């Protein structure tokens, strides 16, 4: 009898572990810049289920590779806060520079590269040890950060300098500076590292860079009937895993551009909420979530159908959105 009960208990415990382990796998996290909160969204139902209080002016946001923490850049607190994904509470901080805005992890999930807008530096942080291990001087107003798929190159975009800086991950030295459009905001590698895409908010373009040669091979421009050119401001970029399609948030144009990953031609514009800023795929890449700062909501795009299927109300001035990696 005892042995049978113990066996049942062991099976039940194992089942609980299997259910609870990926508890955050279907969740999305949205940083609300003016609300000083993070909204948690259930991506199975596409509903906001919780609001987490964080520091002042949260912007950049990512889930750690192991899924244990959500990292949030709290610019006015000069720190990166760590939200425990099991408790949804802030349990620690990481030491950034002044006014951290955006960051990216290396492929191992051990290092974090943080753009500090106010002192023109990129801070390198050991996530497990919660210590600063490096600092790189970059251009004026550093913003976007991307890491090459092999982890060997870090990209930082500097808004005022209008450059994408190529930084060697081993030496922490800048190895190339590539001039792009005015006020570059975001950088994203294709999964095969064949291309680097950089959005330029004021320039109104996306530059395609050959990462090996450090040269711009093409600039993508946008034109939307009825909108002035200055209203079209590219910011966030999301590229499908196979590289076939890219989505670009166009800020106050209230559109997301759908771009052919091979030809670099704009295929379609999707109307979303007001001032769309950043975007991220669900883990299966069937849906794309966009943060719409002025309308205080998130648009859900069906990637196959290329249409908005739902709008989710979140906090005040949503900025970034992040989900666990598959």
Q: Where in the sequence are the language-model features?
A:
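Bacterial N-terminal signal peptides that target proteins for export
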Residues: 1-11
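Predominantly soluble domains enriched in secretory-pathway, periplasmic, or organellar proteins
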Residues: 14-326
